[in-house]
Amino acid sequence: MAEQRYREYLFVLTKVDLILYGNPQRMKKSISILFSLMMLFHTQAQKIDYSLVDKDDYREMNFEIIGKLGSNIAVYKNHKTRHDISVYDNEMQLKDRVPLDFLPDRVMNVDFIPYNDFAYMVYQYQKRNTVYCSMVKINAAGKVMSDPVDLDTSQTSGAGENKIYSLIHSDDKKKILVFKIRRQNDKSYQISTLLFNNQMSLLKKSSFGIQVNDREGVFTDFLVDNDGDFVFGKCTRTGSREYINKIDLVYKAADADTIKVQPVLLKDKTLDEVKLKFDNYNKRIVMTSFFYKQKRGNIEGLYSLVWDKKSQTIAAQTDLTFSDSIRLDAKSETGNIKTAFNDHFIRHVIPVQDGGFAVVSELYYSSSRNNAWNRYDYLYGYGNPFYSPFDMWYYSPMNRFYGYNWYDPFNRFGQQNYVRYIAENIMVFFFDASGKLRWSNAIRKNQYDDQSDSFISYQLFNTGNEIRFLFNQKEKRELLLNSATIDAEGRIKRQPTLKNLNREYDFMPKFGKQVGLRQIIIPCLFKNYICFAKIEF
């Protein structure tokens, strides 16, 4: 539809050019005519549809945007013991709300893997001293297509609210991995994995041990690639308030029973939060992190490592020390150039087909009357990606219920503190296949909110030839959704405030999900209720 409108726009533009050519008086009017046509095309090419408010969708509700199933949009919703799937049409009109009555009372976690016209729903629940990991198939109408199937069970020592199993899948969704991590003692973990294909047929069941040097061991992301290979990083810190001084890359081939451990030599560096990403195009693993040169010092640069699966060797390793010009791009309006990256966090690692990759970071912090902002707590505190509890079970950070908390997600211990959340500039770095920096650029924004970070930060989606960032900006005391794109050469195009915005809806872009090449679903808050908007570009 947008391409057709674009052709019509070009046709009209050509006719205007023929009429105006050679006529100076008419040429004076050309700018306003062309501007009007361009604005008309921009308005037509962008479309926003809002769902109606459902009085059952309170702001305390947990939810997950499942995605596009057939011609429908499916959203999972949970409030207390109620579980439903709401099915919307292409204009976000509610077609049905399907209760998931088969779910037991004590559901610990729910995950969805969407395909073209169905989705797998994997959930875990506890019955007496047994935790079950089960699966059902959901059709495009939100209805159950199969009886529940138990994928695995685990014995536990009593009642608990924490999940045991984690689920990850490959980029092409043809490999699905369910795993659990049991802490045996202070220095030993046992990891059990179940690898399935996209028919949910079991391909491989494995179990292996991991040794850590002390109680300060932490793990990175857990990933599975299109071949079914499993990878994660095992990190070591010298203390609970320190950064990473040692990391091993742990790799298990899909059909193997043993693991390969690749030590990473950090020399004089210590690392911040470590991010991993599979490059399925080139059979590589990309690892990246900010690094420090001094204890309690400033972030000095960006460390990157590329590990080649085929040769099982390190293909590239780079330390990018930030220049003053990069620091000027990254810092906040009132920030210091030396500390420009101290509040930046890596949000995305994006591989491309030629072996290069992009790294996206965001400036993010909070302030409180009672407690100063602490990067250590954000990275290693309870509920965060690197948290490693020392009870019977260790579980990875893929708990979808955590994060959909609209009230002060840093208030982990019940204090009623006033908290202001701040999210500012986005930095994008692009490296070639050898790990050399090709370009960097900044998307400038200035966001803050009190008592909740649900309306700040951003969401990105990839259209193939560019990456689009969506984020709120305050204009005349109102939060308005903004858009900016960056192309393969690092050129940024900042679009004006999105058209057709309903000022009564507050967007929460960080919880959005891309459901098509140019379509994204974003949750909104309307008064005290959650609803959803579909945006097409």
List PLM regions with ranges.
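Beta-propeller blade signature
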Residues: 133-141, 190-201, 244-257, 300-313, ...
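Loop/turn-rich, solvent-exposed surfaces of beta-rich toroidal or solenoidal domains
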Residues: 290, 347-349, 356-365, 404-425, ...
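Beta-strand-rich domains and repeat architectures in extracellular enzymes and scaffolds
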Residues: 52-85
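Conserved blade-ending motifs and adjacent loop-strand segments that build the rim/top face
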Residues: 263-272, 316-341, 441-458, 489-516
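Structural signature of eukaryotic scaffold interfaces centered on beta-propeller domains
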Residues: 56-69, 111-116, 125, 163-173, ...
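Blade-loop segments of beta-propeller domains
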Residues: 93-131, 148-161, 209-218, 444-445
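Structural motif
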Residues: 81-86, 128-136, 186-193, 240-250, ...
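Short beta-strand elements that form the blades of beta-propeller/WD-repeat-like
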Residues: 68-80, 117-126, 173-185, 228-239, ...
